[in-house]
Curated annotation (Swiss-Prot):
Designated name of the protein: Alanine racemase
Catalytically driven reaction(s): L-alanine = D-alanine
InterPro entries cross-referenced by the UniProt entry: Ala_racemase, Ala_racemase/Decarboxylase_C, Ala_racemase_C, Ala_racemase_N, Ala_racemase_pyridoxalP-BS, PLP-binding_barrel
One GO term of the biological process aspect: D-alanine biosynthetic process
Provenance organism: Helicobacter pylori (strain HPAG1)
């Protein structure tokens, strides 16, 4: 039984389909790290991870310690990498929970080494190389090779992997992405020349997987990190139009009509004066608001699907509730409303909502609140 009259519906079959799409593209002997940060981009990290592991994922990737600890409590043996920054104070929890950490400096590695020695355990780390994202990482140069040698000499650490991140592999012209891979491959080869090898070498996110697996840029990679494509979205609209891979929608935001009321002509609906009734108006109230992830700016801007009919979202979205206009709509209290999701039900999908807000589908789905129950079909 639902605890609220609003929820996120997650299509399990679509999650499986999208993971299979990844497997059909990457080399047959490749390892796959399913990226499940931000509550699996809104799909629910535990259940999504369970599905990906069933389908053959070798590793799980998250952004922060709390996400990793949540997964570890359900998957005691699964390799989990924290792709984001891990503060030094987190070292003991990383070690005690057998989590892998991203490292980008000798100073950070030294602290982790000291903590590992103190606990008499080993900490797995993946070294981050900055090839053009200009966010975190060691530069791919001779100085960094010397730094890596020093890190490898530290006791208590297991240098399990090395990776970089592509910043715009979804661009129509792949020059920058290919230059990033050229720099990364050259750096890996320099390390190999000095007998420095890594169990895992990775660079490709969803955009890289969808657009760069047909060349030789990935010749030294053996691990791939799909993220947004697992949840049914292409990294950009341009890639959606040009990519032959079919991805299926996973996430739908739904709510029930909790009350229908008739509002006379000449009234304002909701906070402020953002919707004026120029006729007698049938208003449906939904128990869903911007605290749940339905952006406030969507009021008066989108249509939602009710019984395969389109109804306007009116007024400003409140923190916990919103309004739909039901004039000429066949609906009753308790009926389901699709705010966004499956196109077959005439609803907008998350990428269309994102376009209205001048953002991307990543933000639309990953900001769906945890207070919304995830319902898996």
């Amino acid at each position: 039984m639902l605890k609220r009259a609003s929820f996120v519906e997650v299509n399990s079959a679509s999650l499986r389909h999208n993971f299979s799409a990844v497997k059909s593209i990457v080399p047959k002997d490749a390892h796959i790290m399913a990226v499940v940060k931000a509550n699996a981009y809104g799909a629910g990290a535990i259940k999504a991870s369970e599905i990906f592991l069933q389908e053959g994922a070798n590793y799980l990737g998250v952004a922060a310690l709390d996400e990793a600890l949540e997964l570890r409590s359900h998957f005691p043996k699964t390799p989990i990498l924290i792709l984001g920054y891990s503060p030094n104070a987190n070292a003991s929890m990383l070690i005690d929970n057998d989590l892998s950490a991203m490292v980008f400096s000798l100073e950070q590695a030294e602290v982790f080494s000291q903590m590992a020695l103190k606990s008499q355990k080993r900490l797995k780390v993946h070294l981050k190389i900055d090839t053009g994202m200009h966010r975190l990482g060691l530069e791919p140069n001779f100085k960094s090779i010397e730094t890596i040698k020093k890190i490898r000499a530290l006791k208590g650490l297991e240098i399990e992997g090395i990776f970089t991140h592509l910043s715009n592999a979804d661009a129509k012209i792949k020059t920058h992405a290919k230059n990033q891979m050229k720099a990364f491959n050259a750096f890996l080869e320099q390390l190999l020349d000095q007998k420095i090898e890594f169990q895992y070498r990775h660079a490709y996110n969803s955009a890289g997987i969808l657009s760069l697996c047909n060349g030789n840029e990935n010749r030294l990679l053996n691990l791939y990190r799909p993220g947004i494509m697992l949840y049914g979205f292409y990294p950009s609209n341009g890639m959606k139009e040009s990519c032959p891979t079919i991805l299926k929608n996973v996430i739908s935001l739904k709510a029930q009509i909790v009350q229908i009321r008739s509002v006379k002509k000449g009234e304002f609906i909701g906070y402020g004066e953002h919707f004026y009734t120029n006729e007698e108006t049938l208003v449906g109230v939904l128990a869903l608001g911007y605290a749940d992830g339905l952006m406030r700016a969507l009021g008066n801007r989108i249509q939602v699907a009710i019984n395969n009919q389109l109804a306007p979202l009116i007024g400003k979205v409140c923190m916990d509730q919103c309004f739909v206009k039901l004039n000429d709509i066949q609906a009753k209290e308790g009926d389901e409303v699709i705010l966004f999701g499956d196109k077959s039900a005439r609803a907008n999908d998350a990428s269309e909502i994102a376009a209205l807000l001048n953002t991307i589908a990543y933000e639309t789905i990953s900001t769906l609140s945890k207070r919304l129950e995830r319902v898996y079909i």
